[in-house]
Curated annotation (Swiss-Prot):
Its cofactor is Zn(2+). The gene is secA. It is a peripheral membrane protein. Its EC number is 7.4.2.8. Belongs to the SecA family. May bind 1 zinc ion per subunit. PANTHER family: CHLOROPLAST PROTEIN-TRANSPORTING ATPASE, SECA INNER MEMBRANE COMPONENT OF SEC PROTEIN SECRETION SYSTEM. This is Protein translocase subunit SecA. It comes from Anaplasma marginale (strain St. Maries). One of its GO terms (molecular function) is metal ion binding. It catalyses: ATP + H2O + cellular proteinSide 1 = ADP + phosphate + cellular proteinSide 2. GO terms for cellular component: cell envelope Sec protein transport complex; cytosol; plasma membrane. Keywords: ATP-binding, Cell inner membrane, Cell membrane, Cytoplasm, Membrane, Metal-binding, Nucleotide-binding, Protein transport, Translocase, Translocation, Transport, Zinc. It is an enzyme of class 7 (translocase).
Length: 872
């Protein structure tokens, strides 16, 4: 415990301690005068000098002091920004693969340039990871001036980037992008048909901004690339009508565990309704094996109705269900719940039910970022998750002192009996702040609550802005102006992370709006000066009013999210205030608070509208939050342990796939040998081979199924052992494939290698998709093994390994089957030959072609009967 306390709260707790960091900062400062005397060309040429030193044997640690000093001087010249000493400390922490906990407004964006520049000197690339496209684009353009001045290339990847743009960006020295784009590029690269079409170049060093959001909050959400699967979507609507007819006695809901299930009475009622609708066979039970799929429909419909709320967990936008991120409050467009839950929500909202998807490729952020050779991160809130950062990612969290002491006042919570009383008190508090022109940022946990508060403020005549997933387009502008005198901003958890709230307003953001219609440079300059002067006057007004006031309307499950909201106020020594208003009807206290506390509050005889402030209440709330945090950590640990098993298999499959892409030819001997061994073992039960019809006929039948040719029984008559049979079949397969290869020599060009590689890749992808689906099914029910006193994780490892061996064998068999049955038309058109040659260089020339469309080679056949055979 002592070591943990030192690690979390000792602000310079690394290496030799405080002196280690102070000494480095002192050495950097000592170089400042000399560097300031250099010309721009002399300063900016330091990069090539540093690379020469690295090539001569020096390390990045050796270059830390001069490199940081050069970056600071460059930032001063090109951006008029100079790194503070505490920012240098943050940069050192990042270089040493730590998490730098820096308060809001302390300049994390600028800090990242120090470690990114130093790391980029190796030439292997540095990835600076942000939470959204806006920040990635902004930071790459803003901080890119520093890197470019120093002769380094800077790239940016957003959701709209093309493959060509992505490949160019990954080749840059420093890349800014989001965690989602990086993760999906990794998955997409491992679905490509050629190395040339892959965009990523390796995993060297990642600096993760808002590291708690990416590595903690999103750790439970896997990255999934999916494709449609054939399943009756109409059933979701029919089952939805059935669930609507249920009464509270028919089901039980456990909000704490996010589960809903039928009671005994409910199961009987559902069974009768399903029978009357003809959805299950007469005489069968709801829980019979044959009805397990129908039970799945019912279960997901029940979850959709009883556990997921519109405007809290999701919104309906343009006829689609769009998921709301529970931690940021942002829309997660393009994301869909898996396992039929999204379809159940669409049926619940009476929307068009889209087809269900199956997983084509998946990974988790935990395993993705652990592939990097080096990783570090920045956030304003890391201390509460220090154990998890260390245990999962081997990252130490380090608190960086603020440049100026924090002046924000954090008031005690006010607790009310009902939610109605709480919101009335919140409105009264906002009105009082508004009277003295104190800007107020009101944090809510859902769209529904933010719009309720908006209605109440409108009735009181208070002008305000609302920032939630419905109105996210002007997020940066709204947050940037939330510090103007008398401004009232209602925001969900999204609250503009990455955008500072400047007291008095942000003149740059105001200028974008005010100057849009002015074309004269002189007028624009004069207007901008007016805006700067106005924001300075407004700042004085806000400071006199007490700075930005933060109002929390509910405690989040995680203390860290609450701290993030508080952290919007009091930036860089500004005054500020924060206060939370709670009620006994809030989800946290209702679901996780102890009954003892609730009983105690009721015994106090609180009157309507009366608030209570007591250390016991504060401690009870903190205990409830710790309880939820511990539960969520356990969930993430469990998910990681299971995904580690899948990740090992993912690495095996991706490595085998890359080996195929990296080699022009492939030796199929191992493949058909394993197929033949399995074939003979299934048919010949004894050590010795019996050429009787009972053994010979099944053997020949299997040979025909796999190789597509009739084998004469006489060929096997003189064989005596299983090994001899396998040996003969190996020779037979080798001869067959050599003949096939000869058939694929056309007009002097050998097309066999391309065709064989395409068969290998498509077959492996197909089997991996099926394997992922099987692993998902196994994982869903594996916890039931604990009833039999078995360790679910160990059982999962054993069965997953067995399934992998079976999958690889089926893959070998599929490849041999396809290669044996392939044909090449002798009168192939020039277009066909061109497409073969093009495909040998990378991406498929047939990508995007439906299997039932006519083949583009001009044969007139359907694609699936022509060149589509290479896509199977």
């Amino acid at each position: 415990m002592l070591s943990m306390a030192k690690r979390v709260f000792w602000p310079y707790g690394y290496g030799s301690g405080r002196a280690s960091f102070h000494k480095i900062v002192k050495n950097i400062n000592a170089m400042e005068e000399g560097l300031s005397a250099l010309s721009d060309s002399e300063l900016f040429s330091k990069t090539s000098h540093f690379k020469e030193l690295l090539a001569s044997g020096q390390t990045l640690d050796d270059l830390l002091v001069p490199a940081f000093a050069v970056v600071r001087e460059t930032a001063r010249r090109v951006l008029n920004m100079r790194h503070f000493d505490v920012q240098l400390i943050g940069g050192i922490a990042l270089h040493r693969c730590m998490i730098a906990e820096m308060k809001t407004g302390e300049g994390k964006t600028l800090v990242a340039t120090l470690a990114a520049y130093l790391g980029a000197l190796e030439g292997a690339g540095v990835h600076v990871v942000t939470v959204n496209d806006y920040l990635a684009r902004r930071d790459s353009e803003w901080m890119g001036n520093i890197y470019q001045a120093l002769g380094m290339s800077v790239g940016c990847i957003t959701g709209s980037s093309s493959d060509e743009q992505r490949k160019a960006a990954y080749a840059c020295d420093v890349l800014y992008s989001t965690n989602n784009e990086l993760g999906f590029d990794y998955l997409r690269d491992n679905m490509k048909f050629g190395r040339e079409s892959m965009v990523q170049r390796g995993f060297n060093y990642a600096i993760v901004d808002e590291v708690d959001s990416i590595l903690i909050d999103e750790a439970r959400t896997p990255l999934i690339i999916s494709g449609p699967v054939e399943r009756d979507s109409a059933l979701y609507g029919r089952v939805d009508s059935l669930v609507r007819a249920l009464t509270p006695e028919d089901y039980e809901v456990e909000e704490k565990n996010r589960s809903a299930f039928l009671t005994e009475e409910g199961a009987v009622k559902v069974e009768k309704m399903l029978l009357s609708m003809g959805l299950i066979p007469v005489g069968s039970s709801l829980y019979d094996t044959e009805n397990i799929v129908m039970m799945h429909y019912v279960s997901q419909a029940l979850r959709a109705h009883k556990l997921f709320a519109v405007d809290k967990d999701y919104i309906v936008k343009n006829g689609n269900v769009v998921i709301i991120d529970e931690f940021t409050g942002r829309m997660m467009e393009g994301r869909r719940y898996s396992d039929g839950l999204h379809q159940a929500l669409e049926a619940k909202e009476r929307l068009t039910v889209n087809s269900e998807n199956q997983t084509l490729a998946s990974t988790t952020f935990q395993n993705y970022f652990r592939m990097y050779r080096r990783i570090s991160g920045m956030t304003g809130t890391a201390a509460t998750e220090a154990d998890e950062f260390l245990g999962t990612y081997n990252l130490q969290a380090m608190q960086i002192p603020t440049n100026v002491p924090v002046r924000r006042v954090d008031m005690d919570d006010d607790v009310y009996c009902t939610e109605e009383e709480k919101f009335e008190a919140v409105i009264d508090f906002i009105v009082e702040c508004n009277k003295r022109l104190q800007p107020t940022l009101v944090g809510t946990i859902s769209i529904e609550k933010s719009e309720l508060l908006s209605e109440m403020l409108t009735k009181r005549g208070i002008k305000h802005s609302v920032l939630n997933a419905r109105y996210h387009e002007k997020e940066a502008y709204i947050i940037a102006q939330a510090g103007r005198p008398g401004a009232v901003t209602i925001a969900t958890n999204m609250a503009g992370r990455g955008t500072d709230i400047q007291l008095g307003g942000n003149p740059e953001m105001l200028a974008k709006d005010e100057l849009s219609g002015i074309t004269s440079d002189e007028e624009r300059s004069a207007k901008y000066e007016q805006l700067v002067a106005q924001t300075k006057r407004d700042r004085d007004v806000v400071v006199a009013a007490g700075g930005l006031c933060i109002v929390g309307t509910e405690r989040h499950e995680s203390r860290r999210i609450d701290n993030q909201l508080r952290g919007r106020s009091g930036r860089q020594g500004d005054p500020g205030l924060s206060k939370f208003f709670l009620s006994l009807e809030d989800d946290l206290l209702r679901i996780f608070g102890s009954d003892k506390v609730k009983g105690m509050l009721k015994k106090l005889g609180m009157k309507r509208g009366e608030a209570i402030q007591h250390k016991w209440i504060s401690k009870a709330i903190e205990r409830a939050q710790k309880k939820v945090e511990a539960r969520n950590y356990d969930i993430r640990k469990s998910l990681l342990r299971f995904d580690d098993v899948i990740n090992e298999q993912r690495q095996v499959v991706f490595e085998q796939r890359n080996q195929v892409l990296d080699n022009d030819t492939y030796d199929f001997a191992f493949m058909y040998h394993s197929v033949n061994q399995d074939l003979v073992s299934r048919v010949v039960k004894d050590k010795y081979y019996d050429p009787s019809p009972e053994t010979c006929e099944p053997l020949l039948s299997e040979v025909k199924r796999i190789y597509g040719v009739e084998l004469e029984p006489e060929k096997l008559q003189n064989l005596e052992t299983k090994e001899q049979v396998v040996g003969y079949l190996d020779s037979f397969a080798q001869e067959l494939l050599e003949k096939k290869a000869a058939e694929f020599v056309h007009n002097g060009e050998n097309l066999w290698d391309f065709a064989a590689r395409r068969v290998l890749i498509t077959s492996l992808d197909h089997m991996w998709i099926e394997h992922l689906s099987a692993l998902d099914s196994l994982k869903c029910g594996i916890n039931l093994r604990s009833i039999g006193q078995k360790d679910p994780l160990n059982e999962f490892k054993i069965e997953a390994f067995t399934m992998l061996k079976h999958m690889l064998l089926k893959f070998h068999e599929m490849v041999i089957q396809k290669l044996s049955s392939m044909r090449l038309e002798r009168d192939a058109s020039p277009a066909t030959q061109h497409m073969f040659r093009a495909a040998r260089g990378g991406d498929s020339p047939f990508s995007g072609i439906s299997r039932n469309e006519k083949c583009p080679c001009g044969s007139g056949k359907k694609f699936k009967h022509c060149h589509g055979i290479l896509q199977l």
